């Protein structure tokens, strides 16, 4: 789909040379890597695009100084780029209207595993785990679970138990940091295997 979108943009004069007669040139190319998790780190990603094994480089220098092919390189994820057009159209104050103080905007989460409705969602920062699980995810299959793994391998687990209940945890940077977790990749994994977490029941 990405290649089709690029082709359509080229056909309509929205990419390539002299875009819409503006004198501005801009091309997009898709580089497919081996899918290594480490390539989420900027210098590992540029190394992979260059055709080498995706391995992080020692910093400094940062990629904005010496990145892809040793040239200054801006790296942002797709979610960041998706936020730019509506902010340009509606202004920063509009964007700040979503989410709590210091955690403005929206966030994409991927619901996977043992919830009724899996898939990609976008919610305002500060939406609670309870809202995500029950209002959007449709609840957990079987009804009982002990934890939600958030943010990929380095994100952490939010426990649901008699002594530690994170159902009303706000999903934003500051709230998660207080409990030793982080948004990371935005993954929210609900899995039957989590039922077997070692804990007295």
Please give the residue ranges for each predicted region.
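Residue-level detector of conserved catalytic or cofactor/ligand-binding positions
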Residues: 4, 195-201
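Hydrophobic alpha-helical positions that pack around
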Residues: 5-125, 137-140
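Short beta-strand elements
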Residues: 47-50, 110-113, 171-178, 190-192
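Short, solvent-exposed loop/turn segments at the edges of secondary structure
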Residues: 104, 181-185
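Short, structural beta-strand-to-alpha-helix junction motif
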Residues: 127-132
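Terminal amphipathic helices with adjacent charged low-complexity linkers/tails
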Residues: 143-147, 152-167
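Eukaryotic mixed-charge, acidic/polar low-complexity intrinsically disordered regions
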Residues: 159-182
């Amino acid at each position: 789909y990405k290649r089709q979108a690029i082709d359509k943009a080229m056909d309509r004069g929205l990419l390539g040379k002299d875009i819409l007669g503006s004198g501005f040139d801009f091309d997009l190319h898709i580089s497919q890597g081996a899918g290594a998790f480490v390539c989420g780190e900027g210098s590992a990603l540029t190394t992979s695009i260059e055709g080498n094994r995706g391995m992080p480089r020692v910093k400094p220098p940062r990629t904005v100084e010496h990145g892809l092919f040793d040239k200054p390189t801006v790296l942002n994820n797709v979610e960041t780029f998706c936020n730019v057009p509506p902010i340009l159209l509606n202004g920063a104050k509009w964007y700040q209207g979503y989410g709590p103080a210091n955690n403005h905007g929206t966030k994409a989460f991927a619901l996977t595993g043992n919830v009724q409705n899996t898939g990609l969602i976008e919610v305002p920062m500060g939406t609670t785990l309870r809202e995500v699980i029950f209002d959007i995810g449709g609840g957990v299959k079987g009804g009982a679970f002990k934890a939600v793994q958030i943010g990929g391998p380095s994100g952490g687990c939010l426990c649901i138990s008699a002594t530690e209940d994170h159902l009303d945890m706000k999903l934003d940077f500051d709230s998660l940091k207080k409990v030793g977790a982080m948004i990371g990749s935005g993954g929210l994994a609900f899995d039957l295997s989590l039922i077997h977490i070692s804990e007295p029941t």
